[in-house]
Amino acid sequence: MIFFGSELFAGGHSSTLQDVKARGKLRCVVTTGLPGFAAPDANGVWRGFDWDFCRATAAAVFGDANAVDPITSTGKTRFTKLNAGEGDVLWRNTTITFSRDVSVKLRFLGVNYYDGQGFMVNKSLGVKSAKELDGASVCIQTGTTTELNLADFFSSNNMSYEAVTIETNDEARQNYEAGRCDIYTTDASGLASTRSSLPNPNDHMVLPEIISKEPLGPAVRQGDDAWADIITWVLNTTITAEELGVNSSNVDQMKNSNNPEIRRMLGTDGSQGAELGLSNDWAYQIIKQVGNYGEIFERNIGVNTPLGISRGLNALWTKGGLMYSPPFR
């Protein structure tokens, strides 16, 4: 049987995977810089919640979480860079929508952060509600769902606004800090990140209204289902590990667990690695080098970080949240 235009090799393995392995590095499409999610630190080392999922992918493929390069992108360029082959996978605070899934020819592969759009203001404005923002100037990133949500919210509440369009989070922060806009609107997680980087974070507040659903997740190009499977199960590994109590500190002991699902996940039993075109300890490497979902969350954006975000909807389903993974079976 002959397949034309297929991105799969014989045996069902991914051509993207083969390209990544041949290159020796994963290329991960990320933001230009969003503290807590993906940004270089003072030494130029990339860190953050989304960046850790890039690292988890590299750990699964190479057994080395550091075998990854950032492909920085704005809201306008992220999909172009992915579809043009500049990046292998997108882990970049990106909302899953109908049009992006269907028209942009991407495959979204689960939700790694449940978010919603909010508004940040300087407390000196005396504003307590987003419904008090009539006539305000608003900093807003182009090429995002935020633009459309903002227009809908103001229209439905019979309010007007002046858009101050920007392309990157740094540009938004600079304009907001300089007073060129009264309000900054983006996903609530992004607001927490921006607020933490301001000189006096306590002078600013995020208003109570959340005006949209923003399920954020990874994406790959359409046409390589085997590569999509790998990214899907990288995310699922982190969630399942947290649910089963497996973390970076105890994963070595857990390889000897009597729990059949833990043994399958860690490669002690079964052949899941071979079925993905990976080594049988691929999930072990993710957990050992990067951690489970809870570790990734708390280390980068949790309540004890400058962002101070509580788990909320991103808690496990067993703890009142929405995080839920299919079983390793």
Where do the protein language model's features map onto the residues?
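Sec-exported extracytoplasmic/periplasmic mature domains
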Residues: K21-K25, A58-N66, N83-G87, S124, ...
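Bilobed "Venus flytrap"/periplasmic-binding protein-like clamshell domains
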Residues: K25-G36, G44-F62, T95-I96, D115-E171
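Conserved C-terminal helix/tail region of periplasmic/extracytoplasmic solute-binding proteins
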Residues: R299-R329
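Extended ligand-binding regions for polar small-molecule ligands
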Residues: G11, D52-R55, A59-V61, K123-V127, ...
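Short helix-initiation/N-cap motifs at beta->coil->alpha
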Residues: H13-S14, V68-T80, L125, A163-A178
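Cleavable N-terminal signal peptides
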Residues: F3, L8-F9
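Extracytoplasmic small-molecule ligand-binding "clamshell" domains
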Residues: H13-W91, D269, L276-D281, I286-Q289, ...
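Acidic, polar ligand-binding/catalytic clefts
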Residues: R55, A59, G63-E132, A188-S212, ...
